[in-house]
A protein has these predicted regions:
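Catalytic cysteine-centered active loop of the rhodanese-like fold, especially the PTP/DSP P-loop
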Residues: 101-110, 115
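Metal-dependent polysaccharide deacetylase catalytic core of the NodB/CE4 family, i.e.
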Residues: 1-87, 91-104
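C-terminal domain-boundary segment and adjacent tail
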Residues: 111-137
């Protein structure tokens, strides 16, 4: 699994602050176990669904060995039935590139699929590098 980093996003994409401690444990650890059984990979980063978290949910996920990671850029790409135009998506993404960026692009987006190669090339041409979360301090 070299060069691949899996992050936890929970099993059912529920708002973390609305869940009990047992529900948070289940949402996180059920996915953790499934990924480990399938790939032999132990995840250590979590992105809370919808970016919703509380002190309680952060404390619980920390106790499970997770570090919470948020994003510094996202755009409306998640709705499969309302995809942005490719040209406007490229412009939006490229206009917001910055040092240390954690870019959130949803994998179910056909627009992202179609523009990702161009985006990566353009960002590299701007002098930026792509790094794993493990490489950041």
């Amino acid at each position: 699994m070299k060069d691949i980093l899996f992050g936890n996003h929970t099993v059912n994409h529920k708002s973390m602050p609305s869940l009990t401690e047992d529900q948070i444990n289940s949402e996180v650890m059920d996915l953790h176990k499934a990924i480990y059984e399938k790939f032999g990979y132990g995840m250590k980063y979590i992105r809370p669904p919808m970016g919703e978290f509380s002190e309680k949910s952060i404390s619980i996920t920390n106790s499970l060995g997770y570090k919470t990671v948020m994003w510094s850029f996202a755009y409306e790409d998640w709705n499969e039935n309302k995809q942005p135009e490719e040209s406007s998506a490229k412009k939006k993404i490229l206009d917001n590139v910055h040092n240390g960026e954690v870019m959130l692009l949803h994998g179910n987006s056909k627009t992202n699929t179609n523009v990702l190669d161009d985006i990566i090339k353009e960002i590299k041409n701007m002098g930026y590098e792509f790094k794993s979360l493990d490489e950041f301090k």
